[in-house]
Amino acid sequence: MSRYEKMFARLNEKNQGAFVPFVTVCDPNAEQSYKIMETLVESGADALELGIPFSDPLADGPTIQGANIRALDSGATPDICFEQIGKIRAKYPDLPIGLLMYANLVYSRGIESFYERCAKAGIDSVLIADVPTNESAEFVAAAEKFGIHPIFIAPPTASDETLKQVSELGGGYTYLLSRAGVTGAETKANMPVDHMLEKLNQFNAPPALLGFGISEPAQVKQAIEAGAAGAISGSAVVKIIEAHVEQPQIMLDKLGEFVSAMKAATQK
């Protein structure tokens, strides 16, 4: 069983959904970023979704762009990020760890050597935000070669054909978009996802985690009530980092409070 399968099985037994926070690795710097990831897990995160800093994150709103800039300004490189992820993997051997990133970063390293590096760091899944299913063949092949789950986005506008491809090609979990547009906590998630969840189930997709605009416990509860296996929250987490860059300990305390509250909302 993969780490994701084990996580979903464990949560099912407890009658809970998954809460998965997203952060950019090395935001605001490598050392604090490690403490942030540790705090997220210790406060109840079921898995981590991580970004590798990139100068042009297309699908992201200003909050996550800011995280990328802070990380790059601190001297972050993909290698430093992989090192930090490797340390988290060593500390939490059962934690599912996913990357959410852009194709340029994969290309710049060479597709195969990128996935090989992921496997070495103990990463479970990779979602490439700007690669749709119909352009994904070489990424999926490399992912499978190195035992990494390829993750795909199921957008609210998706045709049945796209949802079928997402279901067949994806592994680990399915990233279900609550709305179109860029990421951000300002624009709340819409929740008419029942139809999509029905279709994904019909096509036997990996469990769906709802993302984009998830910033409060009530939305986590709603996502799970609608039939999602859990929720992903990125911009709301990164906003806490942004607000307390000068107060590292307060930042960790606030992140801990946020994650605990979001995780509590996953109880069915």
UniProtKB/Swiss-Prot annotation:
Record keywords, A-Z: Amino-acid biosynthesis, Aromatic amino acid biosynthesis, Lyase, Tryptophan biosynthesis
Gene3D superfamilies: Aldolase class I
Domain of life: Bacteria
Cross-referenced InterPro entries: Aldolase_TIM (IPR013785), RibuloseP-bd_barrel (IPR011060), Trp_synthase_alpha_AS (IPR018204), Trp_synthase_suA (IPR002028)
SUPFAM superfamilies per record: Ribulose-phoshate binding barrel
Annotated PANTHER family: TRYPTOPHAN SYNTHASE ALPHA CHAIN, CHLOROPLASTIC, TRYPTOPHAN SYNTHASE, ALPHA CHAIN
Assembly: Tetramer of two alpha and two beta chains.
HAMAP family: Trp_synth_alpha (MF_00131)
Family note: Belongs to the TrpA family.
Function: The alpha subunit is responsible for the aldol cleavage of indoleglycerol phosphate to indole and glyceraldehyde 3-phosphate.
Protein name, as recorded: Tryptophan synthase alpha chain
The organism of origin for this protein: Vibrio parahaemolyticus serotype O3:K6 (strain RIMD 2210633)
Gene expressing this chain: trpA
